[in-house]
Amino acid sequence: MESPIRFENVDINQILKTLPHRFPFLLIDRVINIREDYSGIGVKNVSFNEPCFQGHFPDRPVFPGVLMIEGMAQTAGVIGIMSVTGTEKPRAVYFLTIDKCKFRKPVLPGDTIEYHMKSIGRRKAMWWFHGDAKVNGVVVAEADVGAMLTD
């Protein structure tokens, strides 16, 4: 049974209030279904207009895997920051670790990536998440990421 939803739809305006990232390095468009078990789904609509496609690769554009990992981390950051309540609400998130990273299929312009993130551990201000990046329900990348929430 799935955990209850705390935040159904975090739009770009709320993401901008939550994360310090801005263009061209804000790599999620919204986060949906943030649950009480600290899971949620980040959504990224990949456009041919992304700056990375100028060099990756001009004749066959492929969304860089490292940017998918960053998208996972940003999704985890939104989940973590929005899940903390009270006076100790963090204002920043710092990427700490990447483990068990695998790239399975290329992501192309026109694809929509869903970053399915679930907390796998927490110690004080440090959080760890497992993420599966999916396009049309197919896993295209996966990784465990760690981050520290701070003010």
Curated annotation (Swiss-Prot):
Keywords carried by this UniProt record: Cytoplasm, Lipid A biosynthesis, Lipid biosynthesis, Lipid metabolism, Lyase
Family to which this protein belongs: Belongs to the thioester dehydratase family. FabZ subfamily.
Function field: Involved in unsaturated fatty acids biosynthesis. Catalyzes the dehydration of short chain beta-hydroxyacyl-ACPs and long chain saturated and unsaturated beta-hydroxyacyl-ACPs.
UniProt xrefs under InterPro entries: FabA_FabZ, FabZ, HotDog_dom_sf
Organism of this sequence: Rhodopseudomonas palustris (strain BisA53)
Reactions catalysed, as given in the entry: a (3R)-hydroxyacyl-[ACP] = a (2E)-enoyl-[ACP] + H2O
Name of the protein in question: 3-hydroxyacyl-[acyl-carrier-protein] dehydratase FabZ
Active site per UniProt: H56
Localization terms from the record: Cytoplasm
